[in-house]
């Protein structure tokens, strides 16, 4: 498992005093209220201020005090240590932990490995890459078991839930 988790990406500057506009990459963007620090380019940096504007976070970090300094950080990812992550509910997983898991069905057919998780308003979708790409809706009647120790996800056979043209 990864020790660091990505929580956002700096997408622009905000104002002249080093504040930055951040695209949150976490389900609950209000989690920034509780961060004492973030990891920026491998270094721990204290969070001095957090504001919200529409669907973005305005972040002020210690040591970044001008628009010029903030400008250099555009497109940089913000990370936190796993121990500072929010506590997950049962049957919830961080995307970074699901990526690379092998997906098989109850008949033993191997579809491939999870390349990414697509988040949609109704449910997540596993993007599985093997001999061909398959999109697997993350629904209780399709995804039957997730074994993180073995990095193995068991689903119902695709013929039972996937329709072909």
Curated annotation (Swiss-Prot):
SUPFAM superfamilies attached here?
PRC-barrel domain, Translation proteins
One GO CC annotation: ribosome
Annotated compartments: Cytoplasm
Query: GO molecular function: any one?
Result: ribosome binding
Record-level GO BP terms = ribosomal small subunit biogenesis; rRNA processing
Note the Pfam families from the entry. Answer: PRC, RimM
Q: What is its main location?
A: cytoplasm
Q: Which residues form the PRC barrel domain?
A: 90-161
Q: Which InterPro entries match?
A: PRC-brl_dom, PRC_barrel-like_sf, RimM, RimM_N, RimM_N_sf, Transl_B-barrel_sf
The record's Gene3D superfamilies line, in alphabetical order, gives: PRC-barrel domain, RimM
Highest taxon of source:
Bacteria
Keywords for this protein: Chaperone, Cytoplasm, Ribosome biogenesis, rRNA processing
Entries under PANTHER family matching the protein:
RIBOSOME MATURATION FACTOR RIMM
Subunit structure, interactors included: Binds ribosomal protein uS19.
Entry remark concerning the domains of this protein: The PRC barrel domain binds ribosomal protein uS19.
Question: Member of which family?
Answer: Belongs to the RimM family.
Q: State its role.
A: An accessory protein needed during the final step in the assembly of 30S ribosomal subunit, possibly for assembly of the head region. Essential for efficient processing of 16S rRNA. May be needed both before and after RbfA during the maturation of 16S rRNA. It has affinity for free ribosomal 30S subunits but not for 70S ribosomes.
Its protein name is Ribosome maturation factor RimM
- Species of origin reads Clostridium perfringens (strain 13 / Type A)
Q: Which gene encodes it?
A: rimM
């Amino acid at each position: 498992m990864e020790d660091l988790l990505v929580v956002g990406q700096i997408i622009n500057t905000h104002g002249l005093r080093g504040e930055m506009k951040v695209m949150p990459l976490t389900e609950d963007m209000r989690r920034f209220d509780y961060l004492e620090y973030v990891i920026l380019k491998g270094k721990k940096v204290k969070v001095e201020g957090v504001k919200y504007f529409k669907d973005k976070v305005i972040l002020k970090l210690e040591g970044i005090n001008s628009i010029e300094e903030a400008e250099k950080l555009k497109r940089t990812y913000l990370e936190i240590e796993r121990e500072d992550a929010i506590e997950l509910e049962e049957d919830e997983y961080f995307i970074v932990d699901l990526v690379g898991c092998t997906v098989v069905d109850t008949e033993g057919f191997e579809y491939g490995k999870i390349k990414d998780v697509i988040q949609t308003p109704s449910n997540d979708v596993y993007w599985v890459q093997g001999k061909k790409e398959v999109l697997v809706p993350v629904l209780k009647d399709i995804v039957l078991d997730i074994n993180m120790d073995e990095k193995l996800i068991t689903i119902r056979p695709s013929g039972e839930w996937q329709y072909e043209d």
